[in-house]
Amino acid sequence: MRIPFRTFLLFAFCFCALAPALRAQSETDAWLRYAPLDASAKSQFQDFPGTVAVLGDSEILRSAKSELIRGVRVMLGKHLQAVSKLPQGRAIVLGPLADVLAALPSLAIQQQLVADGYLLETIERDGSNTIVITARDDRGVLYGTFALLRKIALGQPLDELHELQNPYAPIRWVDQWDNLDGTIERGYGGPSIFFENGAVRADLTRASEFARLLASLGINGCAINNVNADPRILSPDFLQQLARVAAAFRPWGVRLGVAVDFGSPKKMGGLATFDPLDAKVIAWWKAKADEIYRAIPDFGGFVVKADSEGRVGPSSYGRTQADAANVIARALEPHGGLLFYRAFVYDHHLDWRNPKSDRARAAYDIFHPLDGSFDANVILQIKNGPIDFQVREPASPLFGGLHKTSQVIELQITQEYTGQARHLCFLAPMWKATLDFDMHTPQDATPVKALVAGKAFDRPVGGFLGVANVGLDDNWAGS
């Protein structure tokens, strides 16, 4: 079909006229672009406070304050004045629970707040409404701030707020499979936002923006490098570079983690062995953990991929996966660090002619007999399916086979098996099918989500982890 030239010119003119408006919506801002409300939606916020009292001072509280001021300015056209003490009249009060209760002793809390939970409450004070955003910790205050901004964006009334939210699980992390040269394994959104040319990027603006997006979703940790880890990540020079990434994450309450090569004591530590039960290897991991925490006091922990797809592991010395995990976990434990030990362990040279070769049961066969052998800060990181991240895989049987070991479910956000970012794909229904699946353990009603969150068998840690693999593309994921 031929398009008349005049029609083409009209189309081109209209597109050019609309282009400035289209560019005004930054893809980098994603869901945090805070579009101005229309007149009808904005009318209900005529009495919105003009002052925010920030009780306390920290990097995270400063982020909450700046985010609130930014969102209200764009959506409502109001400029909030920030003060450090409770003012007279209508106000927003933002701060940790102890400080807020000292300023507002009449505030009643009917339900217990846990770490990272938050309370949004509207109370009457001096004849006018005060909106309270509070939590046990600063990170919860930040999450409550994002929650209030969501309500404004949706045009929801704020006159009678009474919302207490606690997280379903303590672990809410994302992983990146970024290489030190700036490439990303299974990444479709451009080069790494963390690395280039074998070093941490000079400009970490996008890393900070990513942490902001993560915080708005309640995500509290991010491991930034490929699970097929480069041993150089633990070199003294590189640790100082990683401290810069941690500094970019810190204002948003996101803890930094890194994937490490299990063979590091030998490959870059100068030892003759990486046997996890060798005294020198044990001492090496302890010294390395101490060194990391001197540079990054709030470091989150390690991710380990061992005995899988050519990566070295404890089987080289006849040791178990628990032997390997516990040695590294004990080095991290005095500092509050976690060890995410991937259960993606199998022989990738399986002989298809052997009828007993069964990759789908490999993780269960290896880790189920070790249940109860892992230290408290070891978290087994289990892919949603027994093979990989394949579409429509059943839930991994290992979720139901661990009653005395903490675990997280590893989900794939990056579209390795769902089109590789050539088109959009709504992943939530697939994840929900797995999370809601009842594993029929001896306890009644044990869906995967309750098992990984630690609720089914009263585990201290556990939760959810997604492999994001965002990049420098404006829209992060490349779709």
Placement of each model-derived feature along the sequence:
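A cross-domain feature marking catalytic cores of carbohydrate-active enzymes
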Residues: 176-178, 226, 258-262, 306, ...
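Active-site-proximal beta-alpha loop/turn segments in soluble metabolic enzymes
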Residues: 230-231, 266-275, 305-316, 346-355
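Extracellular/periplasmic catalytic domains that process cell-envelope and extracellular macromolecules
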Residues: 45-46, 86, 124-127, 166-168, ...
